């Protein structure tokens, strides 16, 4: 989860998960196909915050980068995918105010014809993707992941 209102200083006003209802919560509809769900309703449930899912305020986006851009513009609070927010998290434009994260169980795979993974250009691509994914792992250090 990441938060910004033009500056990470907004996170200083968010001390507990119970502080989030009533704020503008940016919603990524592209996660609706993921089971278990990775959305505000699921996050509030595991955080122990009693919120009616139909009462969760905020715009819904059907392109994954749109809620990220909205958060970066100060439009609300984002439950973001680390893969899409890594740079902004590292440079401080977005912050993770809580140690609780949802795990989706969704995975990405590289698929190629058998043996093609040994070709130099494909092997280099696989190595690059693997290193990029590994670089996001340290952002998860010390976080509680709940399915």
PLM regions and their residue ranges:
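Secondary-structure junction motif
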Residues: 26-47
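C-terminal effector-binding regulatory domain of bacterial HTH transcription factors
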Residues: 82-87, 91, 101-147
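Flexible hinge/capping segments at coil-to-helix
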Residues: 1-28
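Structured beta->alpha junctions
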Residues: 29-32, 59, 114
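Hydrophobic hinge/microswitch elements
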Residues: 49-96, 103-104, 118
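Alpha-helical segments flanking ligand/cofactor-binding loops in enzyme cores
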Residues: 18, 68-69, 123
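Short helix-loop capping/hinge motifs at secondary-structure junctions, enriched
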Residues: 6-16, 33-34, 115-120
């Amino acid at each position: 989860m990441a938060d910004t209102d033009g500056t990470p200083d907004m996170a200083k006003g968010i001390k507990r998960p119970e502080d989030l209802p009533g704020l503008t919560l940016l919603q990524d509809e592209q996660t609706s196909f993921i089971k278990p769900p990775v959305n505000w309703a699921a996050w509030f449930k595991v955080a122990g915050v009693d919120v009616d899912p139909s009462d969760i305020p905020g715009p819904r986006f059907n392109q994954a980068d749109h809620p990220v851009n909205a958060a970066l513009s100060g439009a609300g609070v984002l439950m973001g995918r680390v893969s899409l927010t890594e740079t902004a998290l590292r440079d401080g434009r977005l912050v993770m105010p809580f140690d609780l994260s949802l795990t989706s169980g969704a995975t990405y795979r590289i698929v190629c014809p058998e043996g093609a993974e040994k070709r130099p250009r494909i092997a280099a691509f696989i190595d690059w993707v693997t290193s990029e994914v590994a670089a996001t792992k340290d952002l998860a250090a010390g976080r509680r992941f709940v399915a």
